[in-house]
Amino acid sequence: MVLATTLPDTTWTPSVGLVVILSNLFAIALGRYAIQSRGKGPGLPIALPALFEGFGLPELLATTSFGHLLAAGVVSVGLQYAGAL
């Protein structure tokens, strides 16, 4: 309850969207090298570059979920609280 009253309310702006996109790209790049057993689940329905060989649906869901959590922390706790957004 205390945390909800101390953090400022975040409104959606294009700069917030850019932070979310950059956080997701960072998480995908990090997941590309951090996930040890890739390609165990279903693949993506689109062709990917050779750099992402074995990067399927479970890996995409895991990395974008982490990217959204990372973005929520960066936006609400970091940039919004500092007044940058």
From Swiss-Prot:
One of its GO terms (cellular component) is photosystem I. It is a multi-pass membrane protein. One of its GO terms (biological process) is photosynthesis. Disulfide bonds: none annotated. HAMAP family: PSI_PsaK. This is Photosystem I reaction center subunit PsaK. The keyword Transmembrane applies. It is found in: Cellular thylakoid membrane. The chain crosses the membrane at residues 13-31, 69-85.
